[in-house]
Amino acid sequence: MPAFLEDISRFYGTGEKNREGQTLEEFLEAYDPYKYKNPSATTDTVVFSYRDRVEKDLKGLKVLLVKRSNHPSIGFWALPGGFANLRENLDDTARRELEEETGVEGIPVEQFACYGDYDRDPRARVITTAYMALTDEKNVKVKAGDDAADAAWCTVTCTEEAEKESPEWGVKQYVLRVDNEDRQIHTRALVEKKERKGLIRERKYRVIDGGVIAVDHAAIIVQAMELLRQRVEEVQ
C-alpha cells in the first residue's frame, strides 16, 4: 500500500533497514493499516458566551448546545462536534464542526481534554478530543445546520455538592444545571470528579446522571467550567 504521506523524508531515522531487510519505502508498501480495527476520532467543543465581561463566579455564563436529530442520543442536547476527516488536523475539525452545526466561526478554540472510554459510543470505538472557546454573545449568530435539529445558548451553572477525601484520592460531585426557557430546556446532570493526589494527578470526570445531555458531554462541560473559573481567578 502506498505511503499515507507524499513526503516521507522526515521519517527515515538513521536510514538503516529493519529486521526484515526493508527500507522505509518497502515497509510502507507492505504495511496494512486495516490489519487491526482503528478507533474513530472526533472533536467536541464547549463554547461559552458572556455579556460584556466574564464574572469571577461565572454568573450569567451560557453554553452552546445542539439538539441531536439522529441516533445515538436522538433528541438529547449535545456539544457541537463530529468526526475528523482523514487528512484534517484536529483543531480544524473542531472549527469546521462548530461552523457546520451552529454557524459560529472565527473564534479561538483551545484543546483541553480527551475522553476515550470504550463504551462512550454504540456505533464504534470513538475517542473525542475536547475543545473550549469563549466569546461575547453579541458577536456571534447561532443557526443550526448539518445533523443538528436545533442550536441554542443555554444558561449554565456548576456547583459542588459533595466531597470525599482519602489518603490517595479526592472525590467531588458537581451538579450541572442547563436551562433555556424558549426551548423548554431545564435539565440537571450529576458529575463526579476523581483525582489522585501527589505529583502525578490522575484525573477522571464521570457522568452519574446526564439528564438530557448526551453521552459524557456533561462531564466535558464541568471540566471546561473548572478550567475557565481558574483562568478568570488568575486574571482578576
Map each language-model feature to its residues:
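N-terminal leader/linker segments that precede catalytic domains of diphosphate-processing enzymes
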Residues: 1-236
